[in-house]
């Protein structure tokens, strides 16, 4: 799902941006939540929204909203006393989703994120942080969304779990054609895993584009108070202090090899 906002008025700001289709989009900056609210159409608006190059009409707004799932930073605490199956079944009831075989739908949603059906009988409160996050992904899949919005969560995981979850998201894009938005203040994470990045400041989009290009603009990021990804900063320092031509890398091993080769 490609989403384009043009001259969209939100919280006294005016925003224009594009959420790219079938990829991981990163959103960061002071007004990052404004972008989420725009995508979710939380307020009446002035401006233009197009979905897959078709202008969104008033009569289509409810249908559009049905195509989006939001994964909050934490699983809803009211479900902590529930078993996984009860939690997922309750979500189907709450959103009034009419499905002939809800158990099959729940199992399919679990297996889509590589969880065994034995999880259905486990209590939510007994799950690890990474297991809870996978359950949240599974909950999102219950409604077959075209767009999944993931709010800040990655700081809770070790590197191995972080990589596993992001590989899973990439597979969901490849196999199911999903579009994903990750909202995060962690530019190291965005640099490593996203393809398209939007940075907000002063109630507008400061810059957007290919992540590797946007987050390598070190001087620009510094001027605007945006945290520079560590891998970018290390390479930038080596380039500037040693006056050598080395490339920016996402893989730490490639970066170290390049620095040692030239410095």
Task: Describe every region a protein language model picked out.
Residues 221-263:
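ABC ATPase nucleotide-binding domains
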Residues 101-119:
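Conserved ABC ATPase "signature" region
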Residues 183-185:
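H-loop/switch region of ABC-family ATPase nucleotide-binding domains
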Residues 204-228:
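Conserved beta-strand-loop-alpha-helix hinge in the C-terminal portion
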Residues 47-56, 63-65:
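Conserved ABC transporter NBD signature motif
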Residues 190-192:
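A short, surface-exposed alpha-helical micro-motif characterized by mixed small hydrophobic
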